[in-house]
């Protein structure tokens, strides 16, 4: 396949005003995408965004470009990424566009597309769009220009969709939940969803100002929600990221429940109800404790490369339904086409209600093994992973760890770093093993 120039694994992303993230490129991208998407279908595109101040600028530019190509545009305003995927399906739109840089700081932004079925845009379509980007922008004739409208009830539609994933015979009455919206796209949705299901909700990170998204709050910064759960004597906490596609949780003791533990809860619940199809897909970074806990239940486990795109690919290849990353991207293909933090939280709460159990009880049988990650910078074009010294150090550590440990060495995709990850039963031993391999990598650099 031809190498992509603009699109990465999750659309286009970067610092606002530099590189590819400029209003000029957004305008041209809208036009190029419109040219490709207008060849068939409804000629209708939905645009949603998170709460970054630059979202308004990019929304206007994309809107103009799509209209210039003859496509009708429907604006949602600030809405979670999975809401764009859902409404793209229900409106039978040709595509959905999300303006977001997910968990990144406010000065970054990004643009990604969903296809008409709510899944990530096909690689070949992205290549077609890139080919159109190389051409001069030519506006359609005036009578063919696209029209722009706003979906006034997008929030209500998505709230009802989220609630529809919770069993009708149960409520959340009696639960006190802290919900952290990361000052992002879920700020006006997530608290309402859990309140309407009966919970007492304490909302934090729900006052976006355009520049505070993901700032010391949300799924990538768990300190605030852990403190709040303890201070408020809450039953649990739910932390979302800036665009609402990932989740982390907190139990009543203030302990973080990560994506691996959430996958374990969902797999156990599905198996107990006889609806688990196949097994669970994690990634190379998933904790060995998840693998061992699923083995004990005879639930198959497979690892993909890091990234929810690769988790999805492996789920489709194996025809399984549940997968995700320890960072909190959770996919359940019986409940959506992309990662959805709110829905994942609802499914965990449903498991709690069905089993009349606390979050602590649902995770008690899964032992998270100590995991140490060391980043080693290297210079030059050579590959330290091919060094005999590094290979020998890895073999020595793997031999000493046995079946209760794991070593993973991989290159960073964005920096000249080798990531050394070691897991095992004893934290001090794991740390020593990781440093042993890291020293070998340094000497080979």
Swiss-Prot record:
Its cofactor is Mg(2+). The active site is at 102 (phosphoserine intermediate). Catalyzes the conversion of glucosamine-6-phosphate to glucosamine-1-phosphate. One of its GO terms (cellular component) is cytosol. The gene is glmM. CDD domains: GlmM. Activated by phosphorylation. Belongs to the phosphohexose mutase family. InterPro entries: A-D-PHexomutase_a/b/a-I, A-D-PHexomutase_a/b/a-I/II/III, A-D-PHexomutase_a/b/a-II, A-D-PHexomutase_a/b/a-III, A-D-PHexomutase_C, A-D-PHexomutase_C_sf, A-D-PHexomutase_CS, Alpha-D-phosphohexomutase_SF. The lineage of its organism: Bacteria, Pseudomonadati, Pseudomonadota, Gammaproteobacteria, Alteromonadales. It comes from Shewanella baltica (strain OS155 / ATCC BAA-1091). Keywords: Isomerase, Magnesium, Metal-binding, Phosphoprotein. It is an enzyme of class 5 (isomerase). It catalyses: alpha-D-glucosamine 1-phosphate = D-glucosamine 6-phosphate. Pfam families: PGM_PMM_I, PGM_PMM_II, PGM_PMM_III, PGM_PMM_IV. This is Phosphoglucosamine mutase. It comes from the Bacteria. One of its GO terms (biological process) is carbohydrate metabolic process. Its EC number is 5.4.2.10. The modification Phosphoserine is found at residue 102. GO terms for molecular function: magnesium ion binding; phosphoglucosamine mutase activity; phosphomannomutase activity. Mg(2+) binds at residues 102, 241, 243, 245.
């Amino acid at each position: 396949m031809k190498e992509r120039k603009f699109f990465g694994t999750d659309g286009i992303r970067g610092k606002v005003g530099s590189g590819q993230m400029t209003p000029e490129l957004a305008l041209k991208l809208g036009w190029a995408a419109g040219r490709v998407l207008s060849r068939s279908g409804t000629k209708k595109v939905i645009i949603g965004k998170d709460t970054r101040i630059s979202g308004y600028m990019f929304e206007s530019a994309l809107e103009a470009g799509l209209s210039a190509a003859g496509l009708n545009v429907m604006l949602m305003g600030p809405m979670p990424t999975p809401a764009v995927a859902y409404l793209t399906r229900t409106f039978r739109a040709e595509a959905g566009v999300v303006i977001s840089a997910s968990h990144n700081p406010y000065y970054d932004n990004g643009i990604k597309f969903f296809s008409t079925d709510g899944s990530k845009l096909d690689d070949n379509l992205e290549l077609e769009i890139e080919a159109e980007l190389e051409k001069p922008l030519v506006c359609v004739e005036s009578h063919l220009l696209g029209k722009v409208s706003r979906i006034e009830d997008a929030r209500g539609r998505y709230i009802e969709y989220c609630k529809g994933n919770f069993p009708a015979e149960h409520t959340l009455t009696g639960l006190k939940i802290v919900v952290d919206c990361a000052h992002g796209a879920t700020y006006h949705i997530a608290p309402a969803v859990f309140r309407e299901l009966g919970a007492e909700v304490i909302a934090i990170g729900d006052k976006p100002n355009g520049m505070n998204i993901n700032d010391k709050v949300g799924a990538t910064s768990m300190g605030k929600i852990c403190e709040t759960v303890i201070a408020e004597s809450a039953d649990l906490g739910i932390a979302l990221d800036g665009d609402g596609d990932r989740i982390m949780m907190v139990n009543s003791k203030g302990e973080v429940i990560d994506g691996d533990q959430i996958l374990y809860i969902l797999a156990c619940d599905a198996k107990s109800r006889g609806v688990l199809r196949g097994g669970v897909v994690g990634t190379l970074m998933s904790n060995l404790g998840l693998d061992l806990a699923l083995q004990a239940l005879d639930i198959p486990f497979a690892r993909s490369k890091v990234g929810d795109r690769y988790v999805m690919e492996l789920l489709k290849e194996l025809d399984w339904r549940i997968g995700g990353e320890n960072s909190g991207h959770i996919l359940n293909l019986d409940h959506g086409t992309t990662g959805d933090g709110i829905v994942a939280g609802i499914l965990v709460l449903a498991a709690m209600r069905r089993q009349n159990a606390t979050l602590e009880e649902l995770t008690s049988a899964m032992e998270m093994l100590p995991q140490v990650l060391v980043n080693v910078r290297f210079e030059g074009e050579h590959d330290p992973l091919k060094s005999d010294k590094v290979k020998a150090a890895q073999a020595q550590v793997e031999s000493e760890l046995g079946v209760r440990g794991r070593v993973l060495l991989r290159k960073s995709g964005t920096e000249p770093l080798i990531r050394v990850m070691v897991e095992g039963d004893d934290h001090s031993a794991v740390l020593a093993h990781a440093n042993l391999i890291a020293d070998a990598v340094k000497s080979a650099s």
